[in-house]
Amino acid sequence: MITETETAFLAVIRAFLTEEKASPAEIQGLTEKQWNHLFVLAAQHSLLSAVYDVVGKTPEFAELPDELRRQVKTQAMQSVLQQVSRTALFLSDEKELEHLGVQPLVMKGIVCRSLYPKPDLRPSGDEDLLISAKDFATVDACFMRKGFVRDKETAMPNGAKDGDTPEEMGYIHPKTGVFYEIHTRLFSTESSAYGYLNRAFSDVFAHPSRVEVQGQSIFTLEETHHLFYLLCHSFKHFLHGGVGIRQICDMVQMIRVYGRKIDWEMFWQLCEEYHMTCFCINLLDIGERYLGFSYEASGAVRAAKKLRPDSEALLIDILDAGSFGKSSAGRIHSANITLYAAETGAEKHIAGGIWKSLVPEASYMKNKYPYAARYPFLLPAAYVQRILKWLGQGEKEQKSSIEVGAGRVELLKKYDMIRTADWKKRGDAHAGRIQREK
């Protein structure tokens, strides 16, 4: 069962999403300690501005200590101002790319914000753009010219040669703090846990959609594919350290706005092909129970597969995870166990996950330890450094990550997200592509 404070937090988010006039009844009677926990939850899930917008003028908030109210208001307002600035800078940069002949498909971020009643209260730390591989050199040169810095070593699949195009590259501007992730693939092809998902998006440039943001038209994924991408993105983060409630809000808002444009037969077919029907049904059940979502009101169509939702365990994990499953060191380190289980379906996922964490593939090590990329003969030293760091964590930290990982593997099984012997290869039915009706 979720706690009284968590129930109140979800009620506040529901009020924000649905623009309720009255303050949520669930916040009445909260103690100062519970209010503190509610604000911590809001910050962990990157929703403090939204929470303040709902509760800031309530009598319950007015009764809290001055210092607490000041801190919450200051952090919320700073977040809004930063988001307003980042949005303006992004729209300018996106327009410049268009002038250079590049048509990026903008995903999540600014597109999801535009679905909210008050977009700037839904912050995003970066903007994600999907581009054609042939446009990468143009985009890279543009950002370098504008003073951006590449955030990390080029993300290359194994076997890549010099001059090949990266699958992902981050760019951060040292003065403004603006951060972009440029993708030529939506998911790492090196990941056997979710790399196969790329097949579902192999023809998205053939049928993009346009959205208006502050009077500027930008290209994005077509609505059905965008909703499925949000689901896949949540799945990916769930396999790592966990997915946050904001990602569920994004899905709910996408359906609220575009429910009657989404091809539901196609969407649920994609879910079936990629083995995500159970996961999606339970995510939307959370939306129905706590976030004011309605299939009927939004024009959404339920899955043909009759599964009885049982989303409480999933919700508890989501609330504990924070925005991207980074609420604790134990949860972050546990990702190796869940990823190993998702990749192999092996029963010995704990031992295998720990081993994979200590001895990952060489390409990962070269990204994580730049000296190993510069001087390949030092790769063994990087492995030793990694193992010694894990051994130095102490028994308590090691035990925590193992317990969290084992518990989350049980969730993968419960929501049908882990390989079993009778699984066929996901997405093979149509080579991962479902042709849209012309």
Residue spans for each PLM region:
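Conserved NTP-donor binding/palm subdomain of two-metal-ion nucleotidyltransferases/polymerases, i.e.
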Residues: 1-125, 131-438
